[in-house]
Amino acid sequence: MLELLLQWYRRRFTDPQVIALLVILLAGFCILYFFSGILAPLLAAIVLAYLLEWPTARLQRIGCSRPWAASIVLVIFSGITLLAVFVVAPTVWQQGNNLISDMPKMLNKFNAFAQTLPSRYPALVDAGIVDMMAENLRSKLSGMGESVVKISLASLIGLLTLAIYLILVPLMLFFLLKDKEQMLNAVRRILPRNRGLAGQVWLEMNQQITNYIRGKVLEMVIVGIATYLVFFVMGMNYALLLAVLVGFSVLIPYIGAVIVTIPVVLVALFQWGVGADFWTLFIAYLVVQGLDGNLLVPVLFSEAVNLHPLVIILSVIIFGGMWGFWGVFFAIPLATLVKAVIHAWPEEFIPDAD
C-alpha cells in the first residue's frame, strides 16, 4: 500500500514542471488573497485590457502603431463610457431615491396584501407567520434610514478612492495595451524555467478569460437593454434602475437572477397588484431571462469549457468568499483554471517546452 502511494506521488509530484506550476499557482493565490484590495485598480485595468485588446489588435493590422492604436481605442472607450454615465447615472440616481422614499408605502401595501392571505388560503398560510414577517420587515425598514446615513458618511471616503481609481485605471489600461508584449516578456523572465506545463495551462486559460470577459460585457448590455425595453413599454416604475440591476445580475451566474427578481416582483406588485399587467410583465421578464440562459449564453460562451451548474454556484460562493467582487466576477474562469490544471496534470514526465 505504501509503495503504491509512493509511486503515485512520484508520478504526479516529482516532475519539475509540476513543481513550477504549483509554485506559480500558490504565489498567485497568496498575492490575490492578501493584496486584492490594493490591487483592485490593476485588476480593473487588466479586465478592461482584455476587453479592448481586440480593437487594438485590429487597428494594428490596418497599419496603426501599437501606441497609436492603444490611444485611439482608449479615447473612444472613454467617450462611450462618459456618455453612458452622464445619460444613465442621473436617472438611475433619481429613481433610486424615489424607490427609497416609496419603500414605506410599498411595505404597507404588501402588509395589507399579506394580511388577506390567511383568510383566502387558511390551509396554506398562518396568520401568526404573516404578522411575524410583517414585523420583521417593518424593523428592517426602520433601520434603513440609519444605514443610509452611515453609507453616506462612508461614501465620502469612497468618493476619494473612486477619484484615485479614475486616474490610476486609465493610466494602467493605456500602458497594458501599449506595452503588452514587453510586460509579458518581463513576467516570463521571473517565472521558473521549468514552466512548460504552466505555459500549457496559461494558453488555455488566456483564451478562456478573453472569451469570458467579452461575452460577459455583451451579455450585460444586451440583457439590460432588453429588460429596459420591456419595463419601459409596460410603463413600470423605476424601469431604468431595475434594468441596470438586471444587467449587472448576470455577473453572478444563477444566484444574481434570483436575487434581482425579488425587487422586480415587489415593484410590479406595488404598482399593479396581482392583475393582468403584473402577469404580463412577469411573463415578459421570464422570457428575457429564458432567452438569456438558453440562447444568448450558449452563443456568447460557445468556446468556454462546459461546467455543471452546481460547480458554477459553488465557485461563486467559494471564490466570492475569498476575493469578494473579483472572486464572483472570475468564478467561472477560476473554476475553468482548476479544471484545466486537473486535465493537464501529468502522470509521467513532460519535457520542458522552453
Question: At which residue positions do the language-model features occur?
Answer:
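Hydrophobic alpha-helical transmembrane segments of membrane transport and translocation systems
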Residues: 278-354
